[in-house]
């Protein structure tokens, strides 16, 4: 069983991630994790915070000399800006005289539309949005990317699975239909200012970001994640919570600001007749194959052996320089929302986070299917499973 948790606040000393159930023998380093976190900071339209706030990676358990031990993996992602927040975000009681006059400690009483502020204040009984927004912040995804790096390494080394993402829509701009990057395209995607594989669309996306920034506004978009080398048989049809497409949808919807998930050509299939919506099956020299992959590599909640393909729709960031209308909860009077420092667009980064989430779900399913004591055991079990397939 593979499971994980994160802890920590946006302006706290660190985020912490704990990943349990990782097989022994996965090769991964601090440098690799730092590299993935650097990818999370990519993208045209990011805010000033990305320029000066650094992720300080420390592996504090589960590895020795760059190899997992089979015990829980614990990763600390330190916040280089912590000294500025040490008093305001201190976990222990602080004398009121130390807090007096600190602008960062001023109560945030004007909740932002579209953010967790108001709902969280109501649920947990806070009169200040700070305790809510600190945890609701997308900063938490740094911890997900950290453990997602371990999951990617496991998938690659044990099963030969590679995960890649790209931006397919940003604002009103979309890439050419049918553009499907392979893992070999990863560096080229990351080199693009918006992690877009379509150069012409990327230019228009940059202009869209510039226009939104000029208007003190924000933008959303759509990212696509593909996983190659996924064997048939991960997931199950027998219970609702074992269907892999449901688990992927849950994982992707849990990412901050994600409002929709599509498996394969889901929305287009809904508009099509059955005769052109499904993937016909044909015999080949290497076994049965599907002519197309409209299903996105999943049928009945089970992987088909075709490339897995999912999309996630991200709404525009809810913290705007052009603040929206709200209510000051201390007075009950109309007000403009608080304006926390934020990005114009974080869609490229959402793709990196979505990769991590897809990898974690696939790694969990792989441990369920092929065992989890060691990478060697998983490889052996995968080979035996594929050799014994009744239908190839």
UniProtKB/Swiss-Prot annotation:
Keyword field contains Lyase: yes
GO molecular function: chorismate synthase activity; FMN binding
Organism, scientific name: Salinispora tropica (strain ATCC BAA-916 / DSM 44818 / JCM 13857 / NBRC 105044 / CNB-440)
Biological process per Gene Ontology, one example term: aromatic amino acid family biosynthetic process
Subunit relationships: Homotetramer.
Binding-site positions, FMN: 135-137, 256-257, 300, 315-319, 341
Name of this chain's protein: Chorismate synthase
Gene3D superfamilies: Chorismate synthase AroC (3.60.150.10)
């Amino acid at each position: 069983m593979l499971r994980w948790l994160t802890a920590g606040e946006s302006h706290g000393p660190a985020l912490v991630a704990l990943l349990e159930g990782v097989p022994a023998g996965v090769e991964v380093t601090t440098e690799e994790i730092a590299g993935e976190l650097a990818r999370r900071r990519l993208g045209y339209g990011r805010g000033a915070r990305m320029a000066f706030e650094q992720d300080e990676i420390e592996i504090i358990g589960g590895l020795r000399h760059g190899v997992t031990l089979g015990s829980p993996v614990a990763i600390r992602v330190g916040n280089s800006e912590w000294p500025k927040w040490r008093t305001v975000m201190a976990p222990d009681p602080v004398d009121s005289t130390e807090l007096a006059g600190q602008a960062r400690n001023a109560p945030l009483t004007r909740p932002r539309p579209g953010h967790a502020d108001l709902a969280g204040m109501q649920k947990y009984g806070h009169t200040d949005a700070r305790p809510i927004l600190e945890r609701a912040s997308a900063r938490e995804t740094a911890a997900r990317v950290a453990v997602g790096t371990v999951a990617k390494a496991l998938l690659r080394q044990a099963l030969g699975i590679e995960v890649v993402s790209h931006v397919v829509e940003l604002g009103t701009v979309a890439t050419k239909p049918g553009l499907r990057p392979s893992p070999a395209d990863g560096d080229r995607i990351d080199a693009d200012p918006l992690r877009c594989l379509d150069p012409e669309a990327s230019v228009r996306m940059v202009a869209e970001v510039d226009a939104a920034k000029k208007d003190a506004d924000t933008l959303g978009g759509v990212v696509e994640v593909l996983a190659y080398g996924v064997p048939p048989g991960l997931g199950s049809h027998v219970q609702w919570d074992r269907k892999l497409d449901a688990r992927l949808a849950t994982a992707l919807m849990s990412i901050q600001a994600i409002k929709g998930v599509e498996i394969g050509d889901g929305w287009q299939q809904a508009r099509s007749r059955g005769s052109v919506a499904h993937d016909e099956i044909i015999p080949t020299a290497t076994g049965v194959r599907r002519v197309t992959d409209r299903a996105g590599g999943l049928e009945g909640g089970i992987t088909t052996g075709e490339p897995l393909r999912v999309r996630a729709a991200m709404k525009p960031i809810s913290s705007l320089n052009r603040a929206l209308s709200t209510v000051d909860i201390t007075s009950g009077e109309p007000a403009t929302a608080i304006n926390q420092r934020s990005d114009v667009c974080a869609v490229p980064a959402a793709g990196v986070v979505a990769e991590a989430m897809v990898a974690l779900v696939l790694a969990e399913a792989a441990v369920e299917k092929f065992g989890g004591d060691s990478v060697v055991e998983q490889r052996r079990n995968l080979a035996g499973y594929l050799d014994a397939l009744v239908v190839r």
